[in-house]
């Protein structure tokens, strides 16, 4: 199981939101690149980056920072937030981003998913953000008509190999992950499931490992010091 430290970028800074609310922001660093390098030095094998401004506006906003990250970090970076076209995917992969995450665009534009998966294969990951079991879109501002599991199965049919499953109600709350929902998702699909949202301590890492997810995205708990990255990586092995 891989631990993915999260670097969320808003207005050029490294921040954390609570439940995806843009007015509930805590700034942890003015230098997201340095933050990524810090997690790499501590043993991270992979970095999870979100352009929050991009998620909100529908197109990548923090391109210079993201490009710098891709160049300076020696570990792969997966990026989400505002990726809505094949051209954007191609540009980001050319800049050195390892994987891109399609979220809102996957719900609204299945044709894009089909084309992206056909062209870029494993370099495309589907981000499924759920609120009470329903898929949320547009920076979590709206809820779609899909249940998370139905949507995940649809993405698997289109050729997706990996999904990132986020429980919005837990995100940034340090309330513990929704283990039941994660387990249901793992059992429902035959592709890799990366868990996101609510991780608060080392026990949560152990529990998620037992559920069978292939990776865990950790944000707030790393920034508050409630979770030690090195210990988390050790437990995840």
Swiss-Prot record:
Protein keywords: Amino-acid biosynthesis, Cytoplasm, Histidine biosynthesis, Isomerase
UniProt pathway: Amino-acid biosynthesis; L-histidine biosynthesis; L-histidine from 5-phospho-alpha-D-ribose 1-diphosphate: step 4/9
Enzyme Commission (EC) number: 5.3.1.16
One cellular component term from this protein's GO annotations in UniProt: cytoplasm
Single GO BP term: L-histidine biosynthetic process
CDD domains assigned to the protein according to its UniProt record, in alphabetical order: HisA
Active site positions: 8, 129
InterPro entries with a match to the protein in the record: Aldolase_TIM, His_biosynth, HisA_bact_arch, Isoase_HisA-like, Isoase_HisA-like_bact, RibuloseP-bd_barrel
EC category name: isomerase
Catalyzed chemical reaction(s): 1-(5-phospho-beta-D-ribosyl)-5-[(5-phospho-beta-D-ribosylamino)methylideneamino]imidazole-4-carboxamide = 5-[(5-phospho-1-deoxy-D-ribulos-1-ylimino)methylamino]-1-(5-phospho-beta-D-ribosyl)imidazole-4-carboxamide
Main location: cytoplasm
GO molecular function: 1-(5-phosphoribosyl)-5-[(5-phosphoribosylamino)methylideneamino]imidazole-4-carboxamide isomerase activity
Protein location: Cytoplasm
Highest taxon of source: Bacteria
PANTHER family per record: 1-(5-PHOSPHORIBOSYL)-5-[(5-PHOSPHORIBOSYLAMINO)METHYLIDENEAMINO] IMIDAZOLE-4-CARBOXAMIDE ISOMERASE
UniProt record similarity statement: Belongs to the HisA/HisF family.
Entries under HAMAP family matching the protein: HisA
Protein name: 1-(5-phosphoribosyl)-5-[(5-phosphoribosylamino)methylideneamino] imidazole-4-carboxamide isomerase
Organism whose genome encodes this protein: Thermoanaerobacter pseudethanolicus (strain ATCC 33223 / 39E) (Clostridium thermohydrosulfuricum)
Gene name for this UniProt entry: hisA
